[in-house]
């Protein structure tokens, strides 16, 4: 579709069936291109940088449109603002006679004669036109006060361990543990994502008395008090479990297995303690074929001994097709990884699946260890963090994140 800011010229606008469509959008000196995802359908995709503006409107605008359904998918490193000066559809109770649907972390359908001003909670927004009707909107990225591109996350310290599965002392500053205050050891892993929040698996805490849980950061060997001076025990201020968390009891598989824990006080960052990056730029990626690192204080073998020293192992991310062979449609918002004889195991749940960005060398928390079968015999299942970026950001309005990995 060709876009212009000359309203008088809109009557000459036509829908062009090409894979690559050049958009001439003059707003000052702004000029950029848009990709039509499917040349047979009215589907479009655009990634926006700060300062760029993108206009979307129905084919044949300003005339009403009664053709096929159209979809615009907009992504950015930042939140997205949609401002519609015209939304004109037949007004009815369920908006079934033409509508404009806006998907953020949830979908809202609009009809009637209205205007809209909507902000996303993450870096993706989808607009769906169901004809008949007409609309005209302006889309632009907006920087959250707490979003930062000049920040640090995902750093890693050198390891003195050669050829072993033990991590180096504070090698992974983003690693945290969840423990019961009345007993030694960890019941689950977690990942530091900001100064007040850690990310973990919902099943780790759903049946726990959270008043008797604590978050441990800067730990290496929970049986020793002398190997590092970075260890701090944090009380929990708030527990946020995904509202659609569920378990398939027959197989012990988890759905929407994600939770946030807010600490009572700020986690002090330094060389030995700090946040992982979140996949703001790679939230759609499957990471298939990539090597990832998983961490935990869990069992060293199925029903074996617990490790008091933080362990690491490298797994390979599988394709969704390979995952479906083992777990079926449960893998929509999950991912699986495998390496022969290697795996996360019991008590590793909630810990991170870390992918190293090859360009920046930063560690990105792309997954949460969720479930597995016999520790290394089959691929493990992990919650896909990228699928929940919207939810994470919406639940942590006071958090600051690095949006550039």
From Swiss-Prot:
Domain annotation Peptidase S1: ranges: 161-397
Class of enzymatic activity (EC top level): hydrolase
Keyword ATP-binding recorded: no
Active site, renumbered: 203 (charge relay system), 257 (charge relay system), 349 (charge relay system)
Residues carrying covalently attached carbohydrate according to the record: 113, 209, 229
CUB domain sequence ranges: 42-147
UniProt protein name: Venom serine protease 34
